[in-house]
Each structure stands twice: as C-alpha cells, then as structure tokens.
Amino acid sequence: MTRSVNTPWTLGLTGGIGSGKSAAAQHFIDLGVHVIDADHAARWVVEPGRPALEQIARHFGQGVLQADGQLDRAALRKLIFEVPEQRRWLEALLHPLIAEEIVSHLARAESPYAILVSPLLIESGQSRMTQRILVIDVPQQLQIERTLQRDQISEQQVQAILQAQASREERLRHADDVLVNDRDHAWLRSEVERLHHFYLTLRGGQS
C-alpha cells in the first residue's frame, strides 16, 4: 500500500451494505479524525456541469437525468445492476475521477491520521491509497435485514448489491483489523474508541 507525500497516514474503512460503516465512521469523526467518504466523492464527480455527468447522459440516455439536471441515481442503479457490462463501463469512467477527489480531500487532513470510508475499497483499488484496512463485518442475513429496514428497497435489489460488492470472505482476507458490528451502538462506540487509541499509537511509530 502506498501513500502520496501530500496525504496523511490513511486507514481504509470498508464493509458490505448494512454493515454499519457510516455509524463507525461517525464515531471516528466525533473523536476528531478527518474522514472522507468515497460515496460523497462519487456524488461530487457527477454534479451538474461536471464532465462525467455529460458522458453518463450520452451513454445511457437522458432517462438517467432528473428534470433539474441532477443524476437520477435510482434509474442509473437499475440499469447497471441489470447489465454488468454497463456497470463496468461506469466504473471505468468514475473510479479515476473519484480517486482524484479523495486524494484532494485527504491532503487537507489535519488530524494525526485520516480515514477513507468506501464500500468498494477492495474492488475499486482505493485500498492503494491506504496503509491499513479496517473491515466492519456482520453476518449476511443481518446485512439484508438492516438494509431492507433502512432503504425501502426489495430483497432482490439488496442481493444484487451484495453480488456487486466483494464477498465477505474477500474483504476479510484483506483486513488488518476486523470489527464485528452485531451488537448495540454503545458497544460500537467503545470499540471505535479502542481502535482510535490503537491507531494513534501505531501512527506515532510511522514516518
């Protein structure tokens, strides 16, 4: 794993849909850690007026745009999950642009270390921007239950998302640290605090 001279020591935080990545990331933010969310970067690169949005509209048609010119994410999601080749085309377009946004935001970090939160940390190659990987892990059935409750989508859509992401086993193979998030929020907070102190100690020994 490599690091740009202009970016801080960076922890990659990942996990499947419904694993609790966002909740864990918020606890790190509360502790003063600079966190960049790859999903946010993915939204920034397709804002109206950005070249990527124009290319997407040309490729998929105007049906992927809302009346106000914003990207219709639901329409696009349906298209790319139905046709894997379309998902690969979109990833080839967006992944380099998202990486540029991430590096730009990491360079502004002032905390002792930074965190890159990404559901596709392994699949997208974003792990190359990190020095250590923390996986938020939960049993798949709990992932499905949480996502159905949170997102108001069908179980078929949840299964399609799971299939598009790295498998639980693949994520765990890449993990330096694993947090099994199958308990309550108080426990998650305490585990994040424990890991935060560990990373501060670890970072203290890094150049």
UniProtKB/Swiss-Prot annotation:
Source species of the chain: Pseudomonas fluorescens (strain ATCC BAA-477 / NRRL B-23932 / Pf-5)
Iron among keywords: no
GO BP, sorted A to Z: coenzyme A biosynthetic process
SUPFAM superfamilies assigned: P-loop containing nucleoside triphosphate hydrolases
Keyword Nucleotide-binding: yes
Reaction(s) catalysed (UniProt annotation): 3'-dephospho-CoA + ATP = ADP + CoA + H(+)
Protein's recorded name: Dephospho-CoA kinase
Protein origin, superkingdom: Bacteria
Listed PANTHER family: BIFUNCTIONAL COENZYME A SYNTHASE-RELATED, DEPHOSPHO-COA KINASE-RELATED
EC number of this enzyme: 2.7.1.24
Gene: coaE
EC supergroup of this enzyme: transferase
GO cellular component: cytoplasm
